[in-house]
């Protein structure tokens, strides 16, 4: 009789353990899905902000470039125009960063993708912002 109880209790413990393992796997997969959706939302927001900023900067740079085109240029003005053109090319290369990032990072896990995307943004945006700051500073110095 005791043997039957031992077998029954063992069976109940084993089935409870199997159910808990199954629930753990489901909760982990749900958590992974939520993390992936969060990363996509963050990237989408970042891309929209970057796109708006890029559009504003491109408009300002085109306005500054047209101002320089209409007047006489010195060697310094010519250098500023070259910088503006380089910045415009850099901004144009940012048109589809997410697609390029997806192509380059196929097979990586989500954390590596997020780190690579952030590093790529820093690598591109750092020099662009520095150049824009220098150009605008030079323009203000020349105009003032």
UniProtKB/Swiss-Prot annotation:
Keywords: Amidation, Amphibian defense peptide, Antibiotic, Antimicrobial, Cleavage on pair of basic residues, Cytolysis, Fungicide, Hemolysis, Secreted, Signal. GO terms for cellular component: extracellular region. The keyword Secreted applies. One of its GO terms (biological process) is defense response to fungus. Residues 1-18 form the signal peptide. The modification Asparagine amide is found at residue 70. It comes from the Eukaryota. Its main location: secreted. Expressed by the skin glands. InterPro entries: Bombinin. Belongs to the bombinin family. This is Maximins 8/H7.
């Amino acid at each position: 009789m005791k043997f039957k109880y031992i077998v029954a209790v063992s069976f109940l413990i084993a089935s409870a353990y199997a159910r808990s393992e199954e629930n753990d796997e489901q909760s982990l997969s749900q958590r992974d899905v939520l993390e992936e959706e969060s990363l996509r939302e963050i990237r989408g927001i970042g891309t929209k902000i970057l796109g708006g900023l890029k559009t504003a900067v491109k408009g300002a740079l085109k306005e500054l470039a047209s101002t320089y085109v209409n007047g006489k240029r010195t060697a310094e003005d010519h250098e500023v125009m070259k910088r503006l053109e380089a910045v415009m090319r850099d901004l144009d290369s940012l048109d589809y960063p997410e697609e390029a990032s997806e192509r380059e990072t196929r097979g990586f896990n989500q954390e590596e993708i997020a780190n690579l995307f952030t590093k790529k943004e820093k690598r591109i945006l750092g020099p662009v912002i520095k150049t824009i700051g220098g150009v605008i500073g030079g323009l203000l110095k020349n105009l003032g």
